[in-house]
Structure formats: structure tokens, C-alpha cells
Curated annotation (Swiss-Prot):
Disulfide bonds: none annotated. This is Transcription factor Ken. Keywords: Developmental protein, DNA-binding, Metal-binding, Nucleus, Repeat, Repressor, Transcription, Transcription regulation, Zinc, Zinc-finger. Transcription factor required for terminalia development. Negative regulator of the JAK/STAT pathway: represses JAK/STAT-dependent expression of ventral veins lacking (vvl) in the posterior spiracles. It comes from Drosophila pseudoobscura pseudoobscura. GO terms for cellular component: nucleus.
Length: 569
């Protein structure tokens, strides 16, 4: 049995809205206008053939009878005022226009000339349109408020039901002929609640299936009701007053009056271009703000409680530091001036007193310091003989002799503490005798003390004590080369440089890692698909089986080539 494929219907929900926006934008910018209308006094107006041909049978017949190769067509109306034709274009493109009451007859005659026929019109005569549409033309400068109960019969059908339902539609004005104006001095001027009538209102495409009703109903939002009733007698006597009339399409009540609209005649019912969808809401066709999204809706609301985010384990995200280009930052000239770390003798004494547990490794030092403090040792009894020194160090500490100095106090004297040491005359006289004795210290320890670093005990129990302190930040290190490497953080010195790029490093290990990772394609050589990769030196012709061998080769044989000072060689 043959299977039939199901038919799918694709619907574009915003199709009508997009068409209206495009046609409105084309009308405002007159692009691409392919129809030129020459009115009285040779005033030219630009429009589109598609819109006018769909609305006017006269224009459609002229375009069908005249076959022109040129894309632009000119139609002459020498007896038609350009102002009224401009109102007509606003009405056809946007579905509504704002005119004065005495211009309705002229506009209707123009509609009859273009064979645009309709049995039902809807007009709105409102007092508050005087304030909003007062600057339409120069002749409408002085306006008077009209009565709320003022009725005008214009020889057309009046629909009283639509008057009450469509009172909110009376505030919509044309974008090009309606500007915001201050309230008039006379009474009866209404203040519009929503600022819907702006200088640049959105125009929509004229729908040929819409019914144009003619009705004259007062608006429901008039503020000064008592003043309007008091001035109604004066306004009735002045029949020549210019009263603006809103001539708009019935967009909001189409669904409610569908039965009545089927019986009425439509504009351009015989045209082939009258198939535009009518499912467009009134807010999208009359309000500019309805065609765009509100920006405040896209703003996320702040969370009420931030503790849930902080306590959630999914939010512990570790973001790596941005890798800066090496060699172009932290130069010698950009370093901030550092102040040396000031040693405090009292803090050192408190640190020593906090370690109350006896340590066997410091027994000999405590014994010697105790004898020095009490005068038991002097320069005559001390000899350079090492056996005598060792025998002296093997004596047990006497419990009767108090220990005034900590075990680490001897090994934390620095050159910047000479002033504190000189303040102790009793201890300074005893220490002067130690300069003549040979304690058998290793030369490495003496060299470190000469450089201004701290010397610790040589026994294995004190190996974990950090001996070398940074003069800038006070950080301690157990090895002298670690302190030397750390000082480059403060000084900005980068003694190692890559010869293959501009990178500079503070440590040799960082440079070797850079060579093996960034420049891996340079040091890697391939002898074939079956053989393993070999690593060649970038400074000579030697090759190695592993990266570790290449690193040892670069660190040993080409150590001078890794230094920044030898870049010019």
C-alpha cells in the first residue's frame, strides 16, 4: 500500500507586521518609489504603484493601459491640491489620517476621482486633537475647542455602536502631519493619557478589505467636561471654525462586526491585490511602540538571595590568568620603588620565647651563650684547638644558669641590626672574643653571612629553618639561590631570553619549558612515518631521543646562549 506523505503548513506569525513595516519605511523614505504624482502648481509626490493600484481602480487601469519600459511612471493631476493628495497617501499607507473638518469633503471628492468607493466611513471630531494636531497646517494655528455633544451629519451612514467602542482610536494621528503641541488656552482641551501620537508615528500598509466608516463621536477621555458644555453655544454659532477630524480605518472592531462588514462594499473589491491578511492587532497597526520589543523586558531581575550562588559547588569556577606576552611587561623602568624590610628585634625575641620545648640540637649553643652572658668564658681560655671546642660543646646545660638569649638569636644578626646589637654593652664585649676563635664553620655559611643573609645551625635538626629573608617583602627561603630567584620578582630582572622569539624569563626552567612547548615544531624532526620523532638542538646539529636529553644539553652546553646579556653574540 502506497504511503502518502503528510502535508505540513508553515505559518509566519509576523508576516503582516513585517510587510507593514517595510511599506511604511518605504513611504517615509520615498524609496523605492516608482510612481510620481504631479499635482497643482507642479508639486511632485512620490508613491508606489503597488499600493495605489491596489486601492484605486483608476490608477490600476492607467498602469495596465500604459506599457512603459521605464520603471518610473508619472501621473498628472493638475487640478488637485497637493495637500489633499498628501492626506490621501497618508490614509492609504497608514490606514488613518488627521485632517480638519472642512477638508473632509475635498478628500472625499479626491477619493471619488480615484474611484475609491466605500459606503461607510468613520470620522472622529475631538477637542483634544486640537492640541495634538494643531500644527498640521499654517491655517490651523488658531483653534477653538469644540463641544462634546457636537454632531456633524456628512451625508453618510453613522454607526453609533462603533462610536463608543472605538473612542480609544481617536488619539492616533499621522506621523507626518501630527506633532505634539502644548494645550490650548481655551477650555475643553483634553489631555491625552498615553503619549501615542508622536512626531514619527509608524505607518502601516493600507488594507483594501477594511471598511471605512464615517462617524462623529466625542472622545471618552475629555478632562474639562464642564468648560466644554459652557462654551458649546459659542462654538455652534461659529460654523467656520477649523475642527480636526480623524479619518481612520476600522481596525479594532473587525471581528465584532464581521457580519455587517460582509454586507458592505469594500474598497477595491474588484482588484486582484485585495488578499492581504487582516489578522493584525490594533496596537501593532496604530502604535509605533507595539512594533518593537520593550528594552526593559530583556533586563534580568537581580537575584533576591546571593547566598545560594556562593554556596553552590557548580559556581566554583577557576578562571586562569590571562597569559601576557613575555618580554613586554615588568621592565626595570616600570618597577615601583620598594622599601627594605625592617627587622624588629623584639619580634624575633617573642618568636624565640614561643618555642618553649627544649631541642637537643641547640644544647651546645645554649651552653656557650650562657657562659658568655655570665662571664664564664673569656678570650684566654678559648684556643683554636678543635678538640677543646668539641669538649666544651659536649658539656650538659646547667639548670641553675638562666638562659637569657634564644637558640636562634646568634644566627639572626644582620648588618642592618648593628645598632640594636651595639645597645647591649655586656653582650657586645663577650662577642668580640669570638672573632679570634675558629669554630670550623663551612665556607659556604661564611659567604652567605657576608652577603647579608641569615646563617642557621649546621646540625640536621635545623635544616627545615628558613635562613634567607627577602629584604623587600620579608619572605624566607632555605636556599640562597631561591632567594636570588625570588628577588627578580621585585627587581623585574629577566636574565633568560629566547632567541627564537621575543620572550624573556626570570628562570631558566621557564625558558626551557617555553622552547619545548611553543617552539616544539622547530626542535622536532621526523625521519619518516614509521620512525619516532627526534629532538634537535636549535643552536647546533645534535639530535636527541627525548626531550629530557635536549633540556640537559641546552642547560649545559648552551647555557650562555640562554642569557639575555648574550643576545647580541
Amino acid at each position: 500500500m502506497k504511503e502518502f506523505q503528510r502535508m505540513l503548513m508553515l505559518q509566519y506569525s509576523k508576516h503582516g507586521e513585517c510587510i507593514l513595516k517595510e511599506i511604511g519605511a518605504a513611504f517615509r523614505g520615498e524609496h523605492p518609489a516608482d510612481l510620481t504624482i504631479v499635482c497643482e502648481n507642479k508639486v511632485k509626490l512620490h508613491a508606489h504603484k503597488l499600493v495605489l493600484a491596489a486601492a484605486s481602480p483608476l490608477i490600476r487601469n492607467l498602469l495596465e493601459d500604459t506599457h512603459l519600459s521605464d520603471c518610473s511612471t508619472t501621473v498628472y493631476f493638475p487640478d488637485v491640491n497637493a495637500t489633499y493628495f498628501k492626506f490621501l497617501l497618508d490614509f492609504l499607507y497608514s490606514g488613518q489620517t488627521c485632517i480638519t473638518s472642512r477638508d473632509v469633503n475635498y478628500l472625499h471628492d479626491l477619493l471619488l476621482l480615484l474611484q475609491i468607493k466605500s459606503d461607510s466611513w468613520k470620522t472622529t471630531d475631538s477637542a483634544y486633537l486640537n492640541s495634538k494636531c494643531g500644527s498640521i497646517r499654517e491655517r490651523s494655528r488658531k483653534q477653538y475647542s469644540s463641544s462634546q455633544n457636537l454632531d456633524q451629519t456628512l451625508k453618510y451612514e453613522v454607526d453609533s455602536v462603533d462610536e463608543s467602542r472605538n473612542a480609544a482610536d481617536f488619539s492616533a494621528c499621522s506621523a507626518e502631519h501630527c506633532e505634539s503641541a502644548p494645550e490650548c488656552g481655551g477650555g475643553g482641551v483634553a489631555k491625552e493619557e498615553d503619549d501615542e501620537c508622536t512626531h514619527k508615528d509608524n505607518r502601516s500598509e493600507k488594507d483594501t478589505d477594511e471598511i471605512v466608516n464615517l462617524s462623529n463621536a466625542p472622545p471618552s477621555g475629555i478632562s474639562n467636561h464642564s468648560n466644554t458644555n459652557s462654551n458649546s453655544s459659542n462654538n455652534n454659532n461659529n460654523n467656520s471654525a477649523i475642527n480636526p477630524v480623524n479619518l481612520s480605518l476600522d481596525l479594532r472592531t473587525k471581528s465584532e462586526n464581521s457580519a455587517r462588514s460582509d454586507a458592505s462594499r469594500t474598497i477595491g473589491s474588484g482588484s486582484d491585490h485585495s488578499g492581504i491578511d487582516l489578522a493584525i492587532s490594533a496596537s501593532e497597526s496604530t502604535k509605533r511602540k507595539g512594533l518593537f520589543f520593550d528594552s526593559h523586558k530583556d533586563v534580568l531581575k537581580p537575584l533576591s538571595d546571593g547566598s545560594d550562588i556562593n554556596s553552590s559547588p557548580e559556581n566554583y569556577v577557576v578562571t586562569p590568568h590571562r597569559k601576557r606576552r613575555p618580554g613586554f611587561h615588568n621592565t626595570q623602568s616600570d618597577n615601583q620603588p620598594f622599601t627594605s624590610y625592617q627587622q624588629n628585634l623584639l619580634e624575633e625575641l617573642r618568636l624565640v620565647k614561643s618555642t618553649t620545648s627544649p631541642i637537643s640540637g641547640f644544647s651546645s649553643e645554649k651552653n656557650m651563650l650562657a657562659h658568655l652572658e655570665d662571664g664564664a668564658l673569656n678570650g684566654d681560655t678559648l684556643t683554636p684547638d678543635r678538640k677543646l671546642i668539641e669538649s666544651q660543646r659536649n658539656h650538659a646545660q646547667s639548670p641553675d644558669i638562666p638562659m637569657h638569649l634564644g637558640p636562634q638569636f646568634v644566627y639572626q644578626w644582620q648588618s642592618n641590626q648593628n645598632a640594636a646589637i651595639s645597645a647591649m654593652p655586656n653582650l657586645q664585649s663577650r662577642l668580640s672574643s669570638l672573632s679570634h676563635m675558629n669554630l670550623g664553620l663551612d665556607p659556604e655559611g661564611r659567604s652567605s653571612s657576608a652577603s647579608g643573609s641569615n646563617i642557621a645551625s649546621s646540625n640536621p635538626h635545623s635544616s627545615s629553618v628558613r635562613e634567607y629573608r627577602c629584604e623587600y617583602c620579608g619572605k624566607q627561603f632555605g636556599m640562597s639561590w631561591n632567594l636570588k630567584t625570588h628577588l627578580r620578582v621585585h627587581t623585574g630582572e629577566k636574565p633568560f631570553a629566547c632567541r627564537l622569539c621575543v620572550a624573556m624569563f626570570k628562570q631558566k626552567a621557564h625558558l626551557l619549558k617555553h622552547l619545548c612547548s611553543v617552539h616544539r615544531n622547530i626542535i622536532t624532526t621526523t625521519n619518516g612515518t614509521d620512525t619516532e620523532n627526534r629532538y634537535s638542538c636549535c643552536f647546533c646539529s645534535m639530535c636527541f631521543e627525548s626531550v629530557q636529553e635536549l633540556v640537559r644539553h641546552l642547560s649545559g652546553h648552551h647555557n650562555n646562549l640562554l642569557l639575555t646579556k648574550n643576545l647580541r653574540e
